[in-house]
A protein has these predicted regions:
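Alpha-helical transmembrane segments of multi-pass membrane proteins
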Residues: 99-114, 137-156, 174-187, 342-354, ...
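Long, contiguous bundles of hydrophobic transmembrane helices that form the permeation core
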Residues: 1-5, 180-296
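Hydrophobic mid-bilayer segments of alpha-helices in multi-pass membrane transport proteins
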Residues: 7-19, 26-46, 67-72, 230-243, ...
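C-terminal transmembrane helix pair
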Residues: 186, 342-445
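Membrane-core helix-loop-helix motifs of multi-pass transport proteins
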Residues: 131-239, 405-441
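Membrane-embedded alpha-helical segments and adjacent helix-loop junctions characteristic
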Residues: 48-135, 288-375
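Membrane-embedded alpha-helical segments of multi-pass transporters/permeases
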Residues: 19, 23, 41-45, 114, ...
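Hydrophobic alpha-helical transmembrane segments
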Residues: 8-13, 31-34, 67, 102-107, ...
Length: 445
């Protein structure tokens, strides 16, 4: 009993340490996670060199796979940004008369969010919401909240987004399967948490015009944008290649030449590598961008990923310490005695951590470290389902600790209470619906 108390207290204190150092002391999450790693290792009796070796292997093992995918994904996102491909998708969807404006924003967020970091997606796509709000005299909240909810959903549950890819990789989940589940769950959660929730509010949703300081922001001229075909082909190519790999694994005999080729091109690194050169041509060279210009855009994009790479590397270190110290195995036994379904546990831990830390990425890595050790005790629950459950939890409780909360507040010209009442509630509803959809998937599949 005493050993169980020691294990649980070590984990809880480590989490509190991460939260306090990030929220109160303003530590960078990279430093906070490393500090928690050393603390947990020392509490569990690891030697100094043993801790260092575990941290090194954790960072190296995690970034060895993810660094390349994140780097390539950043190039793809940058090409979407500079070419105007994201605006092209939005303008095309606007022509679908049978789609309402709020549903259009959800679809824009889901499609464009595949290649864009969530904050970048908000900054890049919010002018589209401004444009529609002005043309239709619609409250900006009715458009911006569905957009941001969809972007957050894709960020949390659909690889190749870094956090979703990290979770899938650590749990040993099939990437293609997680993509399919994630898109389905993300669509359901975004539609209910965004448009449906806001429609149920009716006249209680206040009218918010485009703030004066953003009134000059607008989408680019349509004639300057790439074609819809080129845009969709570029965005969906890596997803398609990864799905082909999954189909091959399910339906083909291993060892054949075709199987090997499909396994190769469907690997996330290879798929993203191919997609980058397709983007260079379709969204760049074909539109009179020289290689010098493409190099500049690539270098500018890389400047934004140091932050996420360091955080994910430190998350890998924390995971490695939990495993090497024996804490993970002890925790698995303790959690299995709680009689809580692993899907609910995964969702709840990610939800609480996101609210506490303010970062969906950190929350998902922490939840993975806590939940992963107990999965062997539940062979009936697939790692793909747990990966979606963790992402579903991280969608919710976007509050003042999260920079996205303030971004939405600023762009919508909303008060603090209004942002809580409408945006935070929307993300929580989306998270609940994602949990329900995950449970439903687990019963069907």
């Amino acid at each position: 009993m005493e050993s169980q108390i020691w294990v649980v207290s070590t984990l809880l204190i480590s989490i509190v340490l991460i939260v306090l150092t990030i929220v109160k002391l303003k530590f960078h999450p990279f430093l906070a996670l490393l500090l928690a790693s050393f603390f947990a290792g020392a509490r569990m009796g690891m030697g100094p060199l043993e801790m260092v070796n575990a941290i090194e292997s954790g960072i190296g093992g995690t970034l060895g796979f993810l660094a390349a995918v994140i780097g390539l994904g950043t190039i793809l996102g940058k090409m979407m940004e500079v070419s105007g491909a994201a605006e092209r998708i939005g303008l095309t969807l606007q022509r679908c008369r049978w789609l309402s404006a709020d549903v259009i924003m959800v679809l824009v967020g889901l499609i464009c969010g595949i290649t864009l970091f969530v904050e970048v997606g908000v900054v890049l796509l919010i002018p589209l919401a401004f444009s529609i709000a002005k043309k239709t005299n619609t409250s900006l909240l009715k458009l911006a909240i569905p957009l941001c909810t969809a972007l957050m959903a894709v960020h949390c549950v659909v690889p190749p987004h870094p956090a979703a890819l990290f979770v899938a990789n650590k749990l040993g989940a099939d990437i293609g399967t997680v993509i399919v589940y994630g898109l389905l769950v993300g669509l359901i959660a975004s539609l209910v948490g965004g448009p449906l929730f806001l429609r149920l509010l009716g006249n209680r949703l206040p009218f918010k015009p485009v703030p004066a300081e953003f009134s000059n922001l607008d989408v680019r001229e349509e004639s300057t944008l790439p074609s819809l075909g080129a845009t969709l082909f570029t965005v969906l190519l890596p997803i398609g290649l990864m799905l082909v790999k999954t189909v091959a694994e399910l339906n083909m005999a291993k060892g054949g030449t075709l199987y090997t080729v499909l396994e190769f091109i469907g690997n996330p690194i290879t798929a993203m590598f191919i997609a980058v050169f397709v983007a260079y041509y379709m969204l760049g060279i074909r539109r009179q961008m020289g290689m010098g210009v493409l190099l500049t855009h690539t270098e500018n994009g890389f400047g934004s990923i140091a932050n996420i790479l360091l955080i994910i590397g430190a998350g890998g270190a924390f995971n490695a310490i939990l495993k090497s110290s024996g804490l993970a195995d002890s925790l698995a036994v303790i959690l299995s005695n709680l009689d809580m379904h692993p899907i609910l546990l995964a969702w709840l831990v990610a939800l609480i951590l996101h609210a506490a830390v303010g970062s969906a990425t950190v929350a998902m890595m922490g939840a993975t470290a806590i939940v992963a050790p107990m999965l062997p005790l539940y062979p009936g629950v697939s790692p793909e389902i747990i990966a979606i459950a963790i992402g579903s939890g991280a969608i919710g409780c976007t509050i003042v600790t999260d920079s996205l909360f303030w971004l939405v507040k600023q762009y919508c010209g909303a008060s603090l209470s209004e942002t809580f009442k409408y945006y935070t509630t929307a993300t929580f509803i989306a998270s609940l619906l994602a949990l329900a959809a995950t449970f439903l998937l687990s019963f069907i599949i």
